[in-house]
């Protein structure tokens, strides 16, 4: 697991799946910097009218892109429309330490408890614990903290781990073996699979 800095907070823009797909050819190009600069100015592929929002989206997507290997993004492009959002969730957990902490310390724990639900208040408690040991996070405004919590819960709903009543459910994913093959078995637990389910998938690859 890559050591992620707590300062890599998700700074807005949200999930950005369609925008990621639009920007990938630019990021994969040898003329990346020139093409991204042109996109910031001319809005050729993102179709985000406000320049400030466009710059933020390019920054976030570039950060996520650089977290992963070029080979991963080649794989990403041939995944199905159902698999790509889950793969992007995987990338986000790898990119943003704060989201990874929320997921491991709150969501997975609550899934393994009687509750099997996650609400804003549960995430806020974890935020307060992080703030107590990290001065940088402690310096964030309440509005910023609220945005980060909202972004995380929105991501969970978008990929289907969290329903409208805040109940957690196992993520329905058709390419779980892929994450085992690239040495990221922790992600299956992040998708709320039980150990016996993970073992069954491992055995199918043997």
Short names for language-model regions:
Residues 29, 115-118:
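Short capping segments at the starts of secondary-structure elements
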Residues 10-13, 17, 26, 93, ...:
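Leucine-rich, amphipathic alpha-helical/linker segments
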Residues 19-75:
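N-terminal interaction modules that seed assembly of large macromolecular complexes
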Residues 2-5:
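Short, small-residue-biased leader/transition segments that mark boundaries at the very start
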Residues 141-206:
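Accessory, usually C-terminal, subdomains that scaffold auxiliary metal cofactors
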Residues 50, 128-148:
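Short, positively charged loop/turn segments that connect secondary-structure elements
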Residues 87-90, 94-116:
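Positively charged, polyanion-binding regions of nucleic-acid-associated proteins
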């Amino acid at each position: 697991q890559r050591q992620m800095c707590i300062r890599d907070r998700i700074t807005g823009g949200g999930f950005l799946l369609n925008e990621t797909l639009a920007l990938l050819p630019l990021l994969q190009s040898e003329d990346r910097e020139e093409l991204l600069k042109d996109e910031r100015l001319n809005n050729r592929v993102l179709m985000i009218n406000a320049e400030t929002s466009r710059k933020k989206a390019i920054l976030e997507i570039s950060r996520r892109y650089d977290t992963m290997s070029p080979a991963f993004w080649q794989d990403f492009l041939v995944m199905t429309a159902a698999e790509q959002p889950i793969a992007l969730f995987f990338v986000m957990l790898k990119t943003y330490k704060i989201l990874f902490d929320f997921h491991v310390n709150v969501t997975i724990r609550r899934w393994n408890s009687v509750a099997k639900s996650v609400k804003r208040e549960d995430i806020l408690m974890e935020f307060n614990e992080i703030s107590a040991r990290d001065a940088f996070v402690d310096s964030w405004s309440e509005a910023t903290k609220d945005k980060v919590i909202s972004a995380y819960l929105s991501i969970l709903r978008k990929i289907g781990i969290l329903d409208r009543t805040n109940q957690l459910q196992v993520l329905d994913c058709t390419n779980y073996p892929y994450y085992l093959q690239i040495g990221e078995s922790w992600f299956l637990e992040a998708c709320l699979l039980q150990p016996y389910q993970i073992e069954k998938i491992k055995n199918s690859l043997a």
